[in-house]
């Protein structure tokens, strides 16, 4: 009976020295941990596995990304989402749905072609533009094509959006 009283007393007094040591160790180890990778290639390199073996779930639908979606994710320069020590990405369907949602909910303004340079005060080559359909970064040729055809650039959630060469053919 005395053992039950002492275990109750020690629980009331707070954490035992052993558990506080573990807490301190966990805190110290978090300072020593390398930063979590932002790309799937970076994750594969960290884990020392081939890219083909990376199975990453979509943050929105929960399906695992296909190999093609894994490659597209890094090519689009999107960042992995870390929740604790679990990693998530975004599949092609959810990426398109997210882009559409952002455009519909957070649209700010539209400029035509070369007007983007006067609005931003930057050369078209220095303005980051993502596709408003698939979220790919546009390259210089795609941005110049939009300028030359006097197509719109849209400001959405503080970032510029245009249409990439791939999505342009589906409209």
Curated annotation (Swiss-Prot):
User: Where does the record place Polar residues bias?
Assistant: 17-28
| Keyword match Metal-binding | yes
Keywords recorded for this protein, A-Z: Activator, DNA-binding, Early protein, Host cytoplasm, Host nucleus, Host-virus interaction, Inhibition of host innate immune response by virus, Metal-binding, Modulation of host cell apoptosis by virus, Transcription, Transcription regulation, Viral immunoevasion, Zinc, Zinc-finger
The organism's superkingdom is given as Viruses
Renumbered zinc finger spans (unnamed): 58-94, 131-167
Tell me the Pfam families matching this sequence: E6 (PF00518)
Name the GO terms of the biological process aspect. Answer: DNA-templated transcription; regulation of DNA-templated transcription; symbiont-mediated perturbation of host apoptosis; symbiont-mediated perturbation of host ubiquitin-like protein modification; symbiont-mediated suppression of host innate immune response; symbiont-mediated suppression of host type I interferon-mediated signaling pathway
The annotated region (Disordered) lies at 1-28
SUPFAM superfamilies from the UniProt entry: E6 C-terminal domain-like
Q: Name one GO cellular component term.
A: host cell nucleus
Similarity remark: Belongs to the papillomaviridae E6 protein family.
What is the annotated quaternary arrangement, including any partners?
Answer: Forms homodimers. Interacts with ubiquitin-protein ligase UBE3A/E6-AP; this interaction stimulates UBE3A ubiquitin activity. Interacts with host BAK1.
Q: What is this protein called?
A: Protein E6
């Amino acid at each position: 009976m005395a053992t039950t009283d002492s275990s109750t007393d020690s629980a009331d007094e707070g954490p035992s020295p052993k558990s506080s040591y573990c807490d301190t160790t966990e805190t110290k180890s978090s300072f020593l941990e390398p930063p979590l990778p932002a790309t799937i290639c970076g994750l594969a390199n960290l884990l020392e596995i081939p890219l083909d073996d990376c199975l990453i779930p979509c943050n929105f639908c929960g399906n695992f990304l296909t190999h093609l979606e894994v490659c597209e994710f890094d090519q689009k320069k999107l960042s992995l989402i870390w929740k604790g020590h679990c990693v998530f990405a975004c599949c092609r369907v959810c990426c398109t749905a997210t882009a559409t949602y952002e455009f519909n909910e957070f649209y700010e303004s539209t400029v035509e072609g070369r007007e983007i340079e006067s609005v931003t005060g930057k050369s078209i080559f220095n303005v980051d533009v993502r596709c408003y359909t698939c979220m790919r970064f546009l390259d210089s040729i795609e941005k110049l094509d939009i300028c030359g055809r006097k197509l719109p650039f849209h400001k959405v959630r503080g970032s510029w959006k245009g249409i990439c060469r791939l999505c342009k053919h589906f409209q």
